[in-house]
Amino acid sequence: MLVLVINSGSSSLKYQLRELADDGADGPRPVLAKGLVERIGVPGSDVPDHAAALERVEAEVFRVIGDRPIDAAGHRVVHGGERFTAAALVTNEVIRAIERLAPLAPLHNPAAAQGLRAMTERYPDMPQVVVFDTSFHQTMPREAWQYALPESVYREHGIRRYGFHGTSHDLVAGMAARHLGVAREEFSGIVLHLGNGASATAIRDGASVDTSMGFTPLAGLVMGTRTGDLDPSVVTHLMRTQGRSAEEMDTLMNKESGLLGLAGHADMRQVVEAADAGDRRARTALDVASYRLAKYVGGYHVAVGGAQAIVFTAGIGENSAPFRARVVQRLGALGVELDAAANEAGLSGAGDDGVAVISAPGSAIPVLVIPTDEEQAIARLTWELTRG
């Protein structure tokens, strides 16, 4: 089965063509084609809209597969609000619902809807599926998602914690459960999705019960350019005393902070290199980021009733042995012990199931490194919803 995975941005369209076994068997499947169409709708661009972008995708894809038909398309959508608790088959009403959720994700949902409409017009008979970053976290109990604001703020404006990276957390939790030999619905653990954007999720009995991101992906951990958790009064203080606008504060917190603000580098590799060379700012950035993450791990160990595993995934989680070590070294109170050699080996020391164990044999909680593959997860969900 050929599945085209689409991630539509406001001025870009990222795609992968994945081939799945007809029986939906698990396991890595080949990426037949992938690419990125940029500058959509930008003045002077030769790609005026998402329909034109799809023409480019089509040309590249069919250069690879010839006259083989694409069986289905799966779309990543950032925000599903409270309506979408799982992936859904695309209909006009689903697209309209995504558009109505635009106030919760003004940069992402309108672009996703444009991509969906362009795809539907070009391939009206092709089954399509939408997969939401937020859906996995809709199992959070109210005490985890509700802010201590007046109830009317939630009812009238939808202000609550939603969480993101759900597709990745869901996929990796399933792989961790299989590695441990427990049923998915019996797995309780902590998944750390650490990339330029980063989030931690507490999983109890296979379901998300808490996650570090909140109303937006700004909350939680220290990220490449995002603050993570911040006293909201800092925002009003800077607006009052410096005359900063809401847009300027958005830029400061989302694009100029995090590792970039602390160390001058948004890339974890550069921060680690600078710290090793004696850069004080870089060392401070690593201390702040690892301390923040370790606090979340400790809290989520309580939230899940005792974690069966702590899992690192995504770009930093999979590839930065120095940062993993800094985090795990802070977890001694939980009885967690690192195997330094296994940590250095990382995924090169993974077993046949693709999972690397980086904790020492005597560690109270296994520490795992598991590669995420959100496009593969979207492709598989697309297969599941369209096979019948």
UniProtKB/Swiss-Prot annotation:
Disulfide bonds: none annotated. Catalyzes the formation of acetyl phosphate from acetate and ATP. Can also catalyze the reverse reaction. The gene is ackA. It comes from Micrococcus luteus (strain ATCC 4698 / DSM 20030 / JCM 1464 / CCM 169 / CCUG 5858 / IAM 1056 / NBRC 3333 / NCIMB 9278 / NCTC 2665 / VKM Ac-2230). GO terms for cellular component: cytoplasm. Mg(2+). Can also accept Mn(2+). ATP binds at K14, H193, L194, G195, N196, G197, D267, M268, R269, G315, I316, G317, E318, N319. HAMAP family: Acetate_kinase (MF_00020). The record marks H165, R226 as: Transition state stabilizer. It catalyses: acetate + ATP = acetyl phosphate + ADP. This is Acetate kinase. Its main location: cytoplasm. Its EC number is 2.7.2.1. It comes from the Bacteria. GO terms for biological process: acetate metabolic process; acetyl-CoA biosynthetic process. Keywords: ATP-binding, Cytoplasm, Kinase, Magnesium, Metal-binding, Nucleotide-binding, Transferase. Mg(2+) binds at N7, E374. GO terms for molecular function: acetate kinase activity; ATP binding; magnesium ion binding.
